[in-house]
Amino acid sequence: MPLIYMNITLAFTMSLLGMLVYRSHLMSSLLCLEGMMLSLFIMITLMTLNTHSLLANIMPITMLVFAACEAAVGLALLASISNTYGLDYVNNLNLLQC
């Protein structure tokens, strides 16, 4: 396994570990999720460049679109929770139910 793939896998693993450790705050969970998305984007881009396939060139762009949608929804939820309750705890998400 080349060193670049090992570094990207390590970055994904560290972000996943951070997501599991710091899951009580929404902001830290969103940052760890963005780190995971960034490492997946780099991995998909490198795999696409190595395969030289024209049909696979859309995969990194699709990954970026999903990451942007996830970030927008997460930040909107964070703003809603912090404006309402003043805290960014994940267990406040249960309070948003109707």
UniProtKB/Swiss-Prot annotation:
The keyword Zinc-finger does not apply. Pfam families: Oxidored_q2 (PF00420). Core subunit of the mitochondrial membrane respiratory chain NADH dehydrogenase (Complex I) which catalyzes electron transfer from NADH through the respiratory chain, using ubiquinone as an electron acceptor. Part of the enzyme membrane arm which is embedded in the lipid bilayer and involved in proton translocation. One of its GO terms (molecular function) is NADH dehydrogenase (ubiquinone) activity. The gene is MT-ND4L. Keywords: Electron transport, Membrane, Mitochondrion, Mitochondrion inner membrane, NAD, Respiratory chain, Translocase, Transmembrane, Transmembrane helix, Transport, Ubiquinone. It comes from Pongo abelii (Sumatran orangutan). The chain crosses the membrane at residues 1-21, 29-49, 58-78. Its main location: mitochondrion. This is NADH-ubiquinone oxidoreductase chain 4L. It comes from the Eukaryota.
